């Protein structure tokens, strides 16, 4: 789409929003029901698209994309009326007689820019929240996952008129045109580099943003952890979607006392989950494109390999890799991996672990495996991170009952459930003043008596 076409689309959404149709709860509920029914009707098409773009198997696609989207819609259908209600708050005595309340109101016209790694979920879930909050939306899926982008466009065009919700496909040129436009809110999921560009463009219009970014999410394995279970859950979280998950354990810090034993468990568990020949496993995914394939291969230090390392260039598949005796100076520790490589570093001192993690950008996620409540409290209290798990990985984002988001370099803002509704909602603070009483203290001319009265109320 050209700049003028995008501007025309945005203008049509502004006009539609100004008409007030999206303010009604029934309108929002009907829209969500339409979307839910369409997703169910196109489930096979969605699965096929995800297989084409990322090599995902059907169970993983439903568990991590379609099912979570349907769950978010169901949650909003159950709660949206309550979320929309005005909330009465206490009124100061000095403002007697009046009623004070907070009125949730949609921002208006929002832009949702989504990534390629979970292209269906990370497009639809923020859209669900935006619709529930009463906004119109323009959705821009990633050009790197074209098959999924097309099915998203088909579903949305079947459910909604473009003046309500529309999809813009394309690449960098379309992204630039969209970011040059004046939206009321921008929701972006992707890399830090592009996130900075989004924020720069948003600043030109003073547009509020949510940035869901990433980072090197650490996984700490204490000496008292259930090592076998820790290995199982870390392997699941790391190699899901071939490691292309923003909250995947990026690296493991394992206490030296149990280091050798844990490495052995990791190796056995990886083989158990993916087989001796993972490149022949139809449920194991692929890297999104050749650029990322080559980047990931460049991070492997073959002198430190414990497992894996083989690849299929034609199919863009890399075996699950485990690397041992990694240091913070190694190439694999200089950037977010975003692929099926798991570096395992030994540690000796809790304080050194805390200091090392805090010396870098705040991670999007943190995972700690331990049975010591004091150790868990120390780690989760003294390290800044977006969210995480104790004795598990990645499952903290698979719920609508609490928000998900980053902090510092891993992003700003949150969504899912109530947090998602609030993200796309401006809360108007309103005082409804009665007319049968008008206290004179605030009006000029001032007097010593009025001053005493004011000081009595305001202290």
Question: Which residue ranges define each predicted feature?
Answer:
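N-terminal Rossmann-like NAD(P)+-binding subdomain of aldehyde/semialdehyde dehydrogenases
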Residues: 1-101
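Residues at or immediately preceding the N-termini of alpha-helices
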Residues: 6, 25, 43, 227, ...
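Conserved C-terminal structural/oligomerization subdomain of aldehyde/semialdehyde dehydrogenase
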Residues: 24, 220, 271, 317-459
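Residue-level signal for inorganic ion chemistry
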Residues: 28, 73, 134, 165, ...
């Amino acid at each position: 789409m050209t700049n003028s076409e995008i501007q025309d689309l945005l203008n049509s959404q502004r006009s539609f929003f100004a008409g007030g149709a999206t303010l009604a709860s029934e309108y929002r509920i009907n829209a969500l029901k339409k979307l839910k029914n369409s997703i169910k009707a196109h489930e096979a098409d969605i699965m096929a698209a995800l297989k084409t773009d990322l090599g995902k198997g059907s169970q993983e696609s439903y568990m991590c994309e379609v099912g979570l989207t349907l769950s978010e819609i169901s949650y909003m259908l159950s709660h949206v009326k309550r979320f929309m209600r005005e909330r009465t708050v206490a009124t100061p005595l000095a403002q007697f007689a009046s009623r004070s309340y907070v009125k949730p109101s949609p921002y208006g016209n929002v832009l949702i820019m989504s990534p390629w790694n979970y292209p269906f979920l990370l497009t639809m879930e923020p859209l669900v929240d935006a619709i529930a909050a009463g906004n119109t939306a323009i959705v821009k899926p990633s050009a790197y996952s074209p098959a999924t982008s097309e099915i998203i466009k088909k579903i949305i065009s079947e459910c909604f008129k473009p003046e309500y919700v529309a999809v813009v496909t394309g690449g960098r040129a379309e992204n630039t045109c969209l970011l040059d436009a004046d939206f009321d809110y921008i929701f972006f999921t992707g890399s830090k580099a592009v996130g900075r560009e989004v924020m720069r463009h948003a600043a030109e219009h003073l547009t509020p943003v949510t940035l869901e970014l990433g980072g090197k999410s650490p996984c700490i394995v204490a000496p008292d952890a259930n090592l076998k279970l820790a290995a199982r859950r870390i392997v699941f979280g790391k190699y899901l979607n071939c490691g292309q998950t923003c909250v995947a354990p990026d690296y493991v810090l394992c206490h030296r006392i149990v280091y050798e034993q844990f490495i052995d468990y990791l190796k056995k568990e990886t083989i158990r989950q993916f087989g001796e020949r993972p490149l022949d496993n139809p449920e194991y995914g692929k890297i999104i494109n050749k650029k990322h394939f080559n980047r990931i291969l460049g991070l492997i230090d073959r002198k430190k390999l414990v497992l894996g390392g083989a690849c299929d260039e034609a199919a863009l598949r890399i075996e699950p890799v485990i690397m041992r005796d990694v240091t913070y100076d190694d190439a694999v520790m200089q950037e977010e991996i975003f692929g099926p490589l798991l570096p395992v570093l030994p540690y000796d001192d809790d304080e050194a672990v805390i200091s090392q993690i805090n010396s870098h950008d705040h991670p999007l996620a943190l995972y700690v495996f331990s049975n010591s409540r004091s150790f868990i409290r120390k780690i989760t209290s003294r390290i800044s991170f977006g969210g995480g798990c104790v004795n598990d990985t990645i499952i903290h984002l698979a719920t609508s009952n609490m928000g998900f988001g980053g902090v510092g370099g891993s992003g700003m803002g949150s969504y899912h459930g109530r947090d998602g509704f609030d993200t796309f909602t401006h809360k108007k603070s309103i005082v409804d003043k009665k007319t049968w009483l008008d206290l004179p203290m605030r009006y000029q001319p001032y007097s010593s008596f009025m001053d005493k009265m004011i000081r009595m109320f305001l202290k």
